[in-house]
Amino acid sequence: MNNKYYADAYGPDTKALAACIKKAFEIANTDDEVARVVFYSYTKNNFMQVSKFLGDDNVNQMFSRPMKFRECKKPIKCATAITYKKECEYRDTPKDVIVCCHMDSKDVFKVDDYRTAKYVIALSWTLDGLNAWKARWKAENVLDGRMEEKADAPKNALLLTALQEMDVRMYETKNLSHFDDAETCKTYIRCIHKYLPDVKPSDITDYLVTELGWENKNAAEVGELLQRLREGRSFRGGQKTHLKEYYSRWKEKAVNCAG
């Protein structure tokens, strides 16, 4: 089941916003597990277009208390990035339809990490602002119903093998908070940098999130490590010798899997 939707917009595109609102209400009215619809953006100043549809006074009230409208069976709330993040510290059940208003991929990726989000509908402010997000998730366009071409999972079998092995050796903690896990991750990134020169940081981030279940913020840290090396910078930690042994093992595993 697809749970990611988008509309590309340039500036205050009321048609695109209307399509997002329609989709949000449609989902809320048909999915019994949905508890509410949340309009979400950076600050309260970013809800002017939403106010044109729901009313200024209503939007101001919905920051503190959800409201119901005839068109939607579930309560509707407005939330800024800061207030919604605080709410999510105490809630972890996916029951929200979140409409991200006038945002780009970088900030919508953060919403993906919230366990409260069952559906995400993203509306951009620039026409290419959501390219990375919609490609990662093969999001559906609410304006025409077409599916975005999904970002290909890295076709390099060695990279897939490396990331899967790395995840296991990190005991599937899926973050770098523990020293030993961080060291393991850095070793793998050093090896990928040395022996897989065609791999991009986004290849790593997308695969960790969509296939191995990492949170975006943690996967992005791993991608950033490779980015640093690609740019000629460095970082502390991780094994720097005997990396060819890792690479040789990946090749052997990849051949066995292919056979």
Each model region followed by its residue ranges:
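A short acidic (Asp/Glu
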Residues: 15-22, 45-54, 108-111, 131-135
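Inter-Walker segment of RecA-like/P-loop motor cores
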Residues: 42-94
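A short beta-strand-to-loop transition that corresponds to the Sensor-1 phosphate-sensing loop
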Residues: 83-85, 103, 123-127
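Conserved P-loop NTPase "ATPase switch" module shared by AAA+ and STAND
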Residues: 87-108
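C-terminal, charge/polar-rich interaction regions
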Residues: 183-259
